[in-house]
Amino acid sequence: MLLEKAYRIKKNADFQRIYKKGHSVANRQFVVYTCNNKEIDHFRLGISVSKKLGNAVLRNKIKRAIRENFKVHKSHILAKDIIVIARQPAKDMTTLQIQNSLEHVLKIAKVFNKKSK
């Protein structure tokens, strides 16, 4: 099960807009940029994992764990554009640790509905 196309941020222009106009929150493993988007009624997700973190297998493992976390919480996330950037410590974490760390930083970024979390 994938996140549908409508839930993804792919265009460089969208990434740049969110970097400039969005708000950032970080912990040791992730940086999360959020930006309101009134044109859509659901969240959109962009993931950035630098080549400095490791080979393609490792980077894809991190991206899969991030996407899985958003799939699990899909109905509880506000309609925002969200970019998740993985930092160096994320490469040594298990999938469960990645999900716990990501949930922590997403709560700080206030992307969850108040009634759900």
Swiss-Prot record:
GO biological process assignments: tRNA 5'-leader removal
Cellular component annotations (GO), alphabetically ordered: ribonuclease P complex
Pfam families the record matches: Ribonuclease_P
Top-level taxon of the source organism: Bacteria
EC number: 3.1.26.5
UniProt xrefs under NCBIfam families: rnpA
UniProt record similarity statement: Belongs to the RnpA family.
Protein name: Ribonuclease P protein component
Source species of the chain: Staphylococcus aureus (strain bovine RF122 / ET3-1)
GN (gene name): rnpA
